[in-house]
Amino acid sequence: MGDFRSFRQNGGSSVDFDGIKISLASADKIRSLSYGEVTKPETINYRTFKPEKNGLFCAKIFGPTKSYECLCGKYKKIKYSGVICERCGVEVTSSRVRRERMGHIELASPVAHIWFLKSLPSKICILLDLTLKNVEKVLYFELYIVIDPGVTTFTKNELITDEAYMNAVREYGPDSFTAMIGAEAIRHMLASLDLEKMAVKLRSQAAATNSEVKKKKIIKTLRLVEQFLGSDSRPVDMILDVIPVMPPDLRPLVMLDGGRFATSDLNALYRSVINRNNRLKSLIYLKAPNIIINNERRMLQEAVDALFDNGRRAKVIKGSNKRPYKSISDMLKGKQGRFRQNLLGKRVDYSGRSVIVVGPALELHQCGLPKKIALELFKPFIYSKLELYGIAPTIKTARRMVQNEQPEVWDVLAKVIHQHPVFLNRAPTLHRLSVQAFEPVLIEGKAIQLHPLVCTAFNADFDGDQMSVHVPLSIEAQVEARLLVMSTNNVLNPANSRPIIVPSKDIVLGVYYLSLEEKGGVVHPVTFCATWEAEHAFANGDIGLHTKIRCGIELEDGVKVYTTTFGRLQLLKILPKGVPFESINMVLTVRDISNLVDLVYKTCGHGKTVEFADGIMELGFRYATLSGISFGKDDMVVPPTKSEHVRRANEEVKEYEFQYQEGLITKHEKYNKVVDAWQKCTDLVAKDMMDGISGYESVAEMNSIFMMAQSGARGSAAQIKQLAGMRGLMAKPSGEIIPNPIISNLREGQGVLEYFNSTHGARKGLADTALKTANSGYLTRRLVDVAQDSIIVEEDCGSSNGLVVRATVEGGVVIIPLSDSIFSRVSATDIIDPSDGSVIVRAGEMFDDKSIERIESLGIDSVRIRSVLTCKSKHGICRKCYGADLSNRKLVALGEAVGVIAAQSVGEPGTQLTMRTFHVGGAATRRVENSSMVAFCGGKVKFTNANLITDRDGNYVVLSRSFEILLVDSLGIEHFQGRVQYGGTVYVKEGEVVPIGKKLADWDLYTVPIVAEASGTVSYADMIEGVSYNEVHDESTGILNRMVVDWRQAESSSGLRPRVEILDESGSVAKCQYSKDAVYLLPLGAILNVSNGDVVKAGDVIAKITKESTTTRDITGGLPRVIELFEARKAKVNAVISEIDGYVEFAKDYYKSKRKVIVRSREDKERIYEYLVPKGRHLIVSEGDFIRRGEPLMDGDPDLHEILRVLGLEALAEYMISEIQRVYRLQGVKINNKHIEVIIRKMLQKVEITDAGDTTFLIGEQIDKSRVERINEVMASQGLRCCSYVPVLLGITRASLQTESFISAASFQETTKVLTEAAVAGKVDRLRGLKENIIAGRLLPVGAGYFIDKLKREFTGERQGKQVSVGVGGDLTST
C-alpha cells in the first residue's frame, strides 16, 4: 500500500490508486510526516514580512515563499533546485510545497483527541467502561482516578478528589498506590488494555446475559474492540503526544491594502496551543507547584480541543470581533466545509451567464448566443485560429485584435463556434434535463435565446430567468455533449418516458384553433380529390379554415377519402409518413398533442419526432397569431342561474343550522355538511358557467377564455370558475376550510369581508413556497446521496424473483392500467396465452408494445416482472432487473447511473409542486369523497365477509369492517369490487341482479357510527359525569351533548371502562351474533345518541365518532408524507397490524390504559396472537370479524417496519410504492415505479443477525447484506453453519450514513462522527460510488468511466493497485 508522500511526489495521477484507507495516526507517524517542529507562535516579521524561523510559517520547515528562491536570497533560479541553503536552511524548490509540507508540535503533556472523547458514542468511554462525565473530570484535572489501589481502601477506577489523594499519600505513602490525573491517566489505562482477552471475555458475557440492556452495551463495546483488533489503530493513539501542523498555504496570512493582515482562524488557534505548550514547558522546568502545572495542562487540553473542534466541549473561543474561530472540524463540515464547498462543488472556468428570451426562429438543437458572451468564452480558440490563419503573428497581437473587436475576429468566431456545442444550465438544476447542449447561433443583443420547446425541461419562463453557458473544451467532451446532452437527444423525460418537448401555451392554442371544425356545417361537404385542390379552393376563398370538407388523402396503401377540415390538412403537411391521419383528424387539445408526439416517436423514431416538434411549433405560433384570440372582459360570462344556486345553498345551510339547533346533528357534522353544500353549489355554478361559454354557433363566435382552457393552453376550469363563476370556499393557513364562501367572482369584484377571507389562501401559498422549496431540495439531496452508487454493472444477475404487478384500482375505477406497470420492464416468468398455450413473452424478455397490447386484450390481470428490489448483483444492479432506460425506451446500458436518475425523478417534482402551490390562490379544493356506491356495470350481487343486520326500514346495516360487494357476470367473472364502510346501509340483497347505475349502498363520510346489534334497553356503565363523559352545553343551540372525555387523567378512575350495554327484558345483557354480549366500549370523543334507559332496535346508532374536519390535501400535506415514508419514520399513531389470518376476539382482562385484542388463527384454533391497543383509540374491527394477515386492527397508518416483518419485502415495496405514488398522482405527476424501487433497494441494504451460526457476528448486529451473503458462501463451502438474518429497513438519511464508503458518508452529514468511526475501524474506501470518486478526483465509474475501469480490470486481472491511506488528526499516513 503506497503512502501519501510518495503518491504526491509521483504526481498523484488518478490511475495510481483504487482505494483510500483512513486510520488513527500514531505519534511516530505524525513525526515521520513532519518537516520540522514548530516551537514559536510567531507568523511573519512585521517589518520584513518574511516568515519567522521555527514559527507557524517557517520557510525552513514548510518550504520557500517564492518558487526556487531561498529566504536569504543566496540561491535563486531553478538551476539550484534541491539545494538547501547553508545560511537560512531553506530548500530551493517550488513554493507549491507550502500546500503539502506539514510540521508538528511536541506537547509537554499528552492531551486527548476531542473527536474520540466527545463524538458520541465516545470511543474512550466505551473502552474504559467509564461515563463521559467521569472521563472529563479526570481529563480536565478535577479528580484523580485510582489505577492501582495497592494497600489503600480505594477501589480500581475510583475517582477521588485532590484532598482525598493528598490524605492517602500522607497516610499510606506515595508508593503504596497509584492514582493519576489528566490525559496521562487515560493514556496509561488505554495502554494497559489487552484487547484480545477483552474480546473473548465480552463474547462469553454476551452469550451468558439475558438482559437486553446489558447485551446492547456489551455488543457496543465488543464491536469497538473488534474494530481496533481488525485495524492498525491502537487505543493509545487517541491520546496525543504530538499534534500535526497544517501546511501554511492551507491556513494563509494575506496582506490587505491598508498594511493590515487577514489570517485564517487556524493560525490563532495554533498560536494559543504553542503559547500554552511553551509556558507549560517552562513551568515544568522551573518545578512550579503541582496546582499551577495542572492548571496549565488543563488549558493546553482546552487549546487543542478548540483547534480540533471549537465549541464542542467548552465555551466557543472567539476572536477580537466576537466571531467564533473556525476550527479544523468546521473547515470540513457543513455546506461551506471542504467536502461540499471545494470537493463536490467546484466552480468551472469558461462560463457565462445572462437573461433568457424566447427564440421561436431557432431549431431545436440551437440556442442564440450573444456575440459578447461568445467572444469571451471562445477566446483561447479565437487566439489559436487567428495565429493559424496568419491573421495575427503572435498571441499578443491576437489578444489586442480581440480586445479591439476587429472585423476579422467575428469571421474567426463564426468558424470557431461552427458545430461546437455549448451547455446551457438553469438553476436550480433539479434533474439532468436542466443541463442541455445546443449549437450556438451568434446574435446581437445581450440576452441568450432559448428554443420554446425546451422550456418545460428547464422549467424556464421568460419573466427574468437567467441561464449559464458552459463550453466543453476537449474533443471527447464535445462528442459527449453532442451524443448525450444535445437537446435533440433528450426528447423523453427519464422520470416517466413521456415526451418532454411537447408544445404548450400559444403553440397549443394555435394547433387547437387550426383543428377546430364549424358546428352544424354543411350536410353534404365539398369533396376534393387531393389536398392541392383544397388549397386552391382556400386561396380563392371558397372554403374557410374550419369548413367541413371531404378530401382524398394519399396513404401508403392508396388514396382514402376523409371528412376533415382545411386546417387539419395544414397539420398533415408536417405529419411524418406512417402516422395515421386519424391521429390529427380531431380537435387537438394539449393531451392529444402530447399523445401525438408520443405516437410519432413510437412510429417514426427519434429524428422524425424532432422535425415534427419543430414543425408543429412553427404552425402553432403562426395560427395563434392569425386566430386573433384575446382575453376580454366580456369573455367572462357570469351564468344567469348563479343566484338560484346560491339561494338554494343558503336554504340548505339554514336547514343544517336548524337541525343543529334541534340537536339532530353535532357541530362537526354541521360544519362538514355546510362545507359540502357550498362545494356542490360552487361546482354547479362552475358547470353552468362552462356550459354557457362552451356553446357556440361558429368558430368565429367561440369564447376566447373557453378556448384557452379547453385546449389546455392556459388556465383551467378552476381558475375560470373564480373569474366568472364564484370563488367558492377558501382555506385558512392551517388547511381548514372557512365555511362562509366567497359568492362574488373576480369579474364582479369582492366585498371587504370577502377580500379579507381570500387573503388567507394567497398568503399561505407564498409562505408555503418559501418553506417547502427548502424541504424538497433537502429531500432530493438525501435521495441522491443514498442512491448515488446504484449503477448498472452486469448483463443479468440470473434472478428469477420479482414483483407481481396489477392494475391500480381506486374506488372501483382503474387509475393505472396493467400496461403502464409493465411498460419498460422485463418479464420474470414465461407469460402464456390461456387461449392457445403459446408464449407471449419469455422469462428475461422485455415487454414491447405488441406483447403489452396482447396481454391487455387477453384480460391477464397480473404479471410477475423482474425488479431492482430482487436483483442479486453484488455492487449495483443488472440490466434485466432494471429494464428499459426511460429516456430512450431501450434496455438500459451498462454503466448507467440509475441511482442518480431515480433520485432526480423522485425529488424534482417535489420541488416543482411546492413552488406551484400558490397558483390557485388558496381556493379550497377539497376531494369530494364517495359516500355511496353505484353499480358501474350490470351484474349479480355477491357479498364477502358479510356481517349484516336489518334495521327499522328493512335495509341491511353493515357491522363488518371488511364487507365488500362484488358484481359478477353469468360466467362468475368479477367486474366490480367495492368496500362498504362500517355502519353503512346496503340497498340490495345477495344474488340480486342489478342494472347499471343502481345505488348499492351508502354511508356517512364524516362520522363513524357505533351500531346496536341487538334490540333492548340502553344502560350506561362506568359513565360518570365530569370523569368519563361531559355534558357539553352548546351555546348556540342550548342542547346538551354527552361526549366521552379522557377518563385516565382523573385520579382513581384509570380502571374505568365507559361503555353502553343493551339489556334484554330480564335485565341481563342482551346477546347478539356469535353469542357475544351487546356491550359497546366508547372511545375518546364519541358523542352519545341515546340516553340511559332509552329503548333501541337493532341497527340504531348508539353513538358517533366525528372524523376530523375536512382539510384540503395538496403536496404540502403530501411532501411530508413522502419524506416520512423515505425516512421510514414511525408514525405518531401507528396502526397495529395482524400477523395471521384469523378471527377477532376481545379479551376479558383489561389493563389500565390498554385493551387486549386476540386474533385466533383460522386453521389452528390454538394459535393466537395478542395485541394491546390504547383504550382511547378507535378499533376498526368488531368481535367475530375475519381479518387477514397484515390488515390493521385500528385506524392510522401501519408501521413500515411491521409490514416488512409480518408481510415481507414484496408487500413493503407494494405499500411504499402505492403510498408515494398516491401523493404524486394527486398532483398529476407521473413517476415510473422503478425509480422508487431503486431508492427502496438502498433502504434495504442492511440485515439484522438472528442466529450467528459459526460466524463471528453477534445476534442483533446490523450488517451489510452483501457482506453477510459473502461470508455465508464461505461458511457453506467449509461445511460450517451459516448465520440467519432478517431484512432491516433504514431511512434514507441513516442508509446514507451507513454506506460502505466513508468518504461519501462524511461528505453527507455528521462529518466528524463518520470520520472518527472510520479511523477506528481502519476502513478502506473502495471508491465504487460517484461522490467518493469526484472527491478523489478520479474518472467516475459510470458511462465511459465504467468501461475504462472494466477494460483496465480485464487487462490487469483483478486489480491490486495502490491504496492511499489517510490518518485522522490532520495527518496523511501510509501503512
Swiss-Prot record:
Coiled-coil regions listed in the entry: none
Record protein name field: DNA-directed RNA polymerase subunit beta'
Residues binding Zn(2+) 1, per UniProt: 70, 72, 85, 88
Record's keyword annotation contains NADP: no
Superkingdom as given in the UniProt entry: Bacteria
A GO-annotated cellular component: DNA-directed RNA polymerase complex
Oligomeric and partner information: The RNAP catalytic core consists of 2 alpha, 1 beta, 1 beta' and 1 omega subunit. When a sigma factor is associated with the core the holoenzyme is formed, which can initiate transcription.
Cofactor(s) required, per the database record: Mg(2+); Zn(2+)
UniProt-listed Enzyme Commission number(s): 2.7.7.6
MF term (GO), any: magnesium ion binding
InterPro entries, A to Z: DNA-dir_RpoC_beta_prime, DNA-dir_RpoC_beta_prime_bact, RNA_pol_asu, RNA_pol_N, RNA_pol_Rpb1_1, RNA_pol_Rpb1_3, RNA_pol_Rpb1_3_sf, RNA_pol_Rpb1_4
Family statement drawn from the similarity comment of this UniProt entry: Belongs to the RNA polymerase beta' chain family.
Catalytic reactions of this protein: RNA(n) + a ribonucleoside 5'-triphosphate = RNA(n+1) + diphosphate
UniProt keyword Zinc, yes or no: yes
GO biological process assignments: DNA-templated transcription
Keyword tags: DNA-directed RNA polymerase, Magnesium, Metal-binding, Nucleotidyltransferase, Transcription, Transferase, Zinc
Pfam families per UniProt: RNA_pol_Rpb1_1 (PF04997), RNA_pol_Rpb1_2 (PF00623), RNA_pol_Rpb1_3 (PF04983), RNA_pol_Rpb1_4 (PF05000), RNA_pol_Rpb1_5 (PF04998)
Cofactor notes: Binds 1 Mg(2+) ion per subunit.
Protein's job: DNA-dependent RNA polymerase catalyzes the transcription of DNA into RNA using the four ribonucleoside triphosphates as substrates.
UniProt-annotated binding residues for Mg(2+): 461, 463, 465
EC supergroup of this enzyme: transferase
Residues reported to bind Zn(2+) 2: 797, 871, 878, 881
HAMAP family: RNApol_bact_RpoC
